[in-house]
Structures are given as structure tokens and as C-alpha cells.
Amino acid sequence: MKINRQQYAESYGPTVGDQVRLADTDLWIEVEKDTTYGDEAVNFGGGKVLREGMGENGTYTRTENVLDLLLTNALILDYTGIYKADIGVKDGYIVGIGKGGNPDIMDGVTPNMIVGTATEVIAAEGKIVTAGGIDTHVHFINPDQVDVALANGITTLFGGGTGPAEGSKATTVTPGPWNIEKMLKSTEGLPINVGILGKGHGSSIAPIMEQIDAGAAGLKIHEDWGATPASIDRSLTVADEADVQVAIHSDTLNEAGFLEDTLRAINGRVIHSFHVEGAGGGHAPDIMAMAGHPNVLPSSTNPTRPFTVNTIDEHLDMLMVCHHLKQNIPEDVAFADSRIRPETIAAEDILHDLGIISMMSTDALAMGRAGEMVLRTWQTADKMKKQRGPLAEEKNGSDNFRAKRYVSKYTINPAIAQGIAHEVGSIEEGKFADLVLWEPKFFGVKADRVIKGGIIAYAQIGDPSASIPTPQPVMGRRMYGTVGDLIHDTNITFMSKSSIQQGVPAKLGLKRRIGTVKNCRNIGKKDMKWNDVTTDIDINPETYEVKVDGEVLTCEPVKELPMAQRYFLF
């Protein structure tokens, strides 16, 4: 029997050659391959295939390659490709991507993807599925940030802080063993993966190393604590020994040295450069030149993404609050003004589109918005398509190349940068099942369901007193994956190898899954998926004009964006 493409898409989701629009943007993705097509496409419901003796095998037990969870007919958007597949989950990890079902009566069922009595099903046909987002720049100021992050499809937070202390409001740092231990205990109750950054400042190695041994997953150097060449060198020395990443917010005022001095202190070692454009902080006015170096892993924070008519105006007040500055002190105002440059913010848009800036993050509650990392990534992509047109690599009128470039900025690339790509960051076999389902019309704006470790943790769902799940008010709510002891199974605390070897999780009584940070020091820009371009970036110190290979990079701020007021009442 044959049905037309429209009927097929309505029943099983789009297939090869079909295109799907992302939210209300001008971006379209095309299905590159379909692993579920043919035989009887697996779906669930009354009169459907996934019944005992049909798509479900009722004879196999869970120990016989039967899945715990099957996502059917998902349109996967990942650095690995844009394709249709079933996703099989067992013990909280992805064990198969292909075709699920009953191999006794169905052709082409992927090994390890047997649907049996033990299997739960999520109908993903008509949905886009991405890996959970990874935000590497979070100020741990308010635990309510977690719900906001989950709503935008973010499942991992790396950062520092102890609450609304002045040090935490300004710097992503949890300072010293005592504070690190307390935050490790506190984050036990959060339904999100966590890695804590220690303070990368000390006159000797010992005060830095003791933080790594206490459970820090990396180090942060920040100008508000003194981003001196000596601090940079010592932190990188510790990082090389402990195999953790160092993130840097360099010296805006150029007091301890200029960009060249910072690069000299880094000395070719790998480092993660936060808000590399500079509005969030860093050597004024040329910090963005770091983005072109092969050992620098550059990221943006979301308040400058993308460049709009409001971007400049909102930054000054944000900066004064976050860095404990006073409006009546001229030097404080001058410090703030030096960081806000329309020319470099405009160029930042284009550097993302060229694959020179590799990652996105939020700077949550400290000049950034915890729930807008994914949203602003795709707003930037849409703005660039409208202003620069399709990329040369695109085919068939789709935006697949650009889509893979931009989705990598908040999934696989931050995972690689922070040494956690063996656990999270992509939809691949062996990865922890942190998955986000999106309705295409709400893509990047409001996640339909967020799966943590194979269990639904957050979902758009209706009135809990209703007779069915859909009556209004439909809103994002925490689900069973966040309740009781299950929260320990569905979330990972990432820690340094040395702290795990020294028994810190047991000493602190941690119950969550523990993930080891590793492979941070043998990487570089070349490892940033779809965003590995190195080049010379020249910034004029007087006009702030940005050039790459002699070409001036600039674009106009926009007055309107997609994925904005159409989706939000407030």
C-alpha cells in the first residue's frame, strides 16, 4: 500500500527530502537519511504497530537486549547529521540509533533495539530531537535558574558561585575547598548536570590545586580577582597536571598586561576564552583576536547575541550592577564604557557564522539570561541568513550546514571544551540520554519535553486537575525525573579525576552519578565540530573596526527578531 508524502509525514514524521522550518525563522532543515523507513514504521497507540506480538516482542525479558525507552521516528538535529531514526535507551544511556521493534517479525531492526514488555515509548514523530544543551558559563546565584534552563533545553551547567554574594554575582567562581564542598552538596538536589569551577588565582600552586582535589571540575580566571600573567600561568600549570579546563575573563583595563602579555602567559596551552567579543569583559579593545588562535576555544555569552538596536543600551546598566561599580565614580563609568563596542559586537555575529567563534553560553544572572542560550543561538543563525544569505556549502535550498554549525555551539563543542564529551553533548551510542524534544513551531524557544538520563524531567503539560494532559494552562513543569531519589540517577556531577580518586564523593556523601572530567589538555580549535576555523583577526585600536583576511566584518543591528514576542506574554 502507498500513501502520499503528506499522509506519511502526518503519521510518521518527515522522511528523506522533506524540509522542516525551525520556529518562525527563515531556517529550514532537510532530512538527510531515514533509518526507520520501510516494513511497518513503528508507532504507538490504539490500532498501531507497537502491540504485543506485532512491534512489541512479548517473549524477551529485559536482560535480552530489550530497551527501557524507545523514542520513535525522531528527527535528530545533531553535529553528526540531520536524520530520522528511532532512539533506544537502556540504563539511562543511548544504546541504539536506528530502527526499534520486534526482530522476530520485522526486517531491519537494529541490534540492541528490541521493543519488549519492559519498554516505555515516547512518540517523537513530528518532533525535532537534540542533545541537551551545555551552558559552560553560569553564575550559581539562584537555584531557580535550573528550571529556566531546562525550559530552554539546557541539561548541563558549568560555572561557579555560592549564591548572591558579590564574588558570585561578578565571577563564575566557587572559591576554595570549603565552598566547593558545600556547593557539591547543594547541587545534589538540582535536576541538572553540574560542574563547578574553582578560583584560578594564587601566588603558588597549592591554593589552586587544593580546589581541584576538593572536587572542582575546572578553573576560572577572572579580572575581578586579578587576571595577571602569573595567575594564568599557574592555573594552566595545574590544569595540565590535573587534566581540567581553564576558562578566562581577561584584564579589561590592561593593568597587568595587554593581550600580547596574556597570550605570552598562555604560551600555546589550550584555554577556554569566555565572551571573547569583550562586552562581557576582557582586554579592551582587541580581546576578540584570541578567537583566531589554534589553542583558544572561543565562546560567546548571550546578551550580545545577536546584534540588535537594543544591545548597546542595555549593556551599561547590566555591567555596572554585575561588577559592583558606581555611577558616581567616573573611573567606574569609564571602565564600563570601554567594554561596549558596537563594531566588535557586529563582527561577533559574522565570526559565529564563519565558524570562528565555536561556542555559546549564557553568563546567567551576570549579564546573561539562563533560559535563552538555545534561543539566541538560533536568532543569530537566522539574522546571518537574512543578512549574508545561504552559506556556500548549502544544498537543495536547505540550511543543514548552518544548522549543524549552530547546534554544535551549545552541545558537542562545550562538552569537548570542558572534558565531558564522553558522557554528554551529542546523540550517539554510549552517551547519557539527555535529550530534548521540540515541536518545530516552538523549536529553540520552549522545549516540549526534556529527558534526563532516560526519564522525562521537564515537560509542557496542562492542568494537573484535568481529565487529560492537554487542557490549558499548558506550561513547563517539573516531572517525575526530578522527584525523590530518582534525581540522583538522572543527573551527573562532573568532578576532577584527582578528587574522585581521593574519594571525595564518598566523603561528602554524594548520591548522584559522578562523571570524570578528562581529555581537556590535548585538544584545540581543530576539535571544535563545524566551528574549527583559525585566522588572523585584526581590531583597530582607535575605530574598533574588525578585519579578517583584510575584509572588514560588520553588519547592521536589527529591529525585529524571530523567536521573540510571538512566543511570550511577558
UniProtKB/Swiss-Prot annotation:
Localization of this protein: Cytoplasm
UniProt binding sites for substrate: H139, A170, H222, H249, A366
Principal place of residence: cytoplasm
Residues of the Urease domain: 132-570
Cofactor: Ni cation
Pfam families from the UniProt entry: Amidohydro_1, Urease_alpha
Residue numbers binding Ni(2+) 2: K220, H249, H275
Pathway note: Nitrogen metabolism; urea degradation; CO(2) and NH(3) from urea (urease route): step 1/1
One Gene Ontology molecular-function label: nickel cation binding
Keywords: Cytoplasm, Hydrolase, Metal-binding, Nickel
Top-level taxon of origin: Bacteria
Reactions catalysed, as given in the entry: urea + 2 H2O + H(+) = hydrogencarbonate + 2 NH4(+)
Cellular component aspect of the GO annotation: cytoplasm
Activity regulation remarks: Inhibited by fluoride.
EC number(s) reported in the record: 3.5.1.5
A biological-process GO annotation: urea catabolic process
Positions annotated to bind Ni(2+) 1: H137, H139, K220, D363
Catalytic residues (positions): H323
Cofactor: binding comment: Binds 2 nickel ions per subunit.
Location of N6-carboxylysine modifications: K220
Signal peptide: none
Protein family membership: Belongs to the metallo-dependent hydrolases superfamily. Urease alpha subunit family.
Complexes and interactors: Heterotrimer of UreA (gamma), UreB (beta) and UreC (alpha) subunits. Three heterotrimers associate to form the active enzyme.
Protein name: Urease subunit alpha
Organism encoding this protein: Sporosarcina pasteurii (Bacillus pasteurii)
Lineage start: Bacteria, Bacillati, Bacillota, Bacilli, Bacillales
